[in-house]
C-alpha cells in the first residue's frame, strides 16, 4: 500500500476532470481487483493454517484498494482525510457471492494438517450500498502459487449505444491501474480502424511509471520509513 502507484489512485480520480463525473453506477459496469502471487506458502504454513488467504491479503490490502477506488471525495488529499473517506466507504460494503480454493500440493507442505480446508485462493464479489455504487459488482480475486505475479485494478465502463459501425456494440472502455509487476495505468478507448468504413478497434493510452522514473522510484518500505521519521 506504500507503493508509489497506489498513492496515485486518489490523484488520478480527483485531479482529472474526465474521471470523477463518470465514477458511478451510471457509467461503470464493474470493478475487479486482482492480487495474484507465484510463490507458494511453504515458508508460511504456520500462519496460513491459522488465517488463510482471506486474512492474509483480502481483509487488509485488497479492501484498502477497494476503498481507494470506491470512496467519496475526501475533504483533502491528506492521509487523515483519505482515511476517513475510506472508513465511511467500507461501512457500506457487503459480501454478495464467491468461492474459495486451494492449490494442488498445499496438503503436502510440512506442517499442514491432514485434510486441511484452508483457502489459498479467493474469488469474491462485494456490493456497496450507497447512491454512487448501488448495483455495481466489486470483485476481489487473489491466490497463491499461480502462473503470474500480478496486482491490478480493472475498472470496466458500460458500453455505448450501438452506432453505425461494423463492430456493434464496440469494445468497452477500461481503465487499468497496474501495481505489480509494471507500475502504471492504461486507458482503453475505441478508435477508427485504418481504411474505409466505420469499423472501430480498441486502442490503449498508457502511462508507465517505471519507464519514466525507473530507479528513482522509492521502495514501499522506504516510503514507510520516511513517514515514520
PLM regions and their residue ranges:
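Secretory/organelle targeting and membrane-embedding segments
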Residues: 2-229
Amino acid at each position: 500500500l506504500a507503493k508509489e502507484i497506489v498513492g496515485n489512485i486518489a490523484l488520478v480520480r480527483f485531479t482529472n476532470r474526465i474521471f470523477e463525473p463518470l465514477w458511478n453506477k451510471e457509467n461503470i459496469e464493474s470493478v475487479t481487483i486482482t492480487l495474484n502471487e507465484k510463490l507458494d506458502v511453504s515458508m508460511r504454513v504456520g500462519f496460513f493454517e491459522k488465517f488463510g488467504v482471506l486474512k492474509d491479503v483480502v481483509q487488509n490490502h485488497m479492501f484498502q484498494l477497494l476503498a481507494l477506488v470506491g470512496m467519496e471525495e475526501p475533504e483533502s488529499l491528506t492521509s487523515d482525510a483519505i482515511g476517513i473517506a475510506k472508513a465511511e466507504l467500507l461501512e457500506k460494503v457487503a459480501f454478495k457471492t464467491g468461492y474459495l480454493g486451494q492449490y494442488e500440493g498445499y496438503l503436502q507442505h510440512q506442517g499442514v494438517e491432514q485434510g486441511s480446508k484452508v483457502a489459498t485462493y479467493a474469488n469474491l464479489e462485494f456490493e456497496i450500498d450507497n447512491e454512487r455504487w448501488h448495483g455495481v459488482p466489486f470483485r476481489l480475486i487473489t491466490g497463491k502459487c499461480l502462473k503470474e505475479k500480478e496486482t491490478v485494478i480493472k475498472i470496466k465502463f458500460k458500453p455505448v449505444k450501438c452506432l453505425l459501425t461494423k463492430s456493434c456494440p464496440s469494445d468497452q472502455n477500461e481503465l487499468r491501474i497496474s501495481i505489480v509487476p509494471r507500475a502504471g495505468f492504461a486507458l482503453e478507448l475505441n478508435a477508427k480502424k485504418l481504411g474505409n468504413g466505420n469499423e472501430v478497434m480498441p486502442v490503449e493510452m498508457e502511462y508507465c511509471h517505471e519507464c519514466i522514473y525507473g530507479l528513482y522510484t522509492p521502495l514501499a518500505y522506504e516510503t514507510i520509513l520516511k513517514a515514520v521519521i
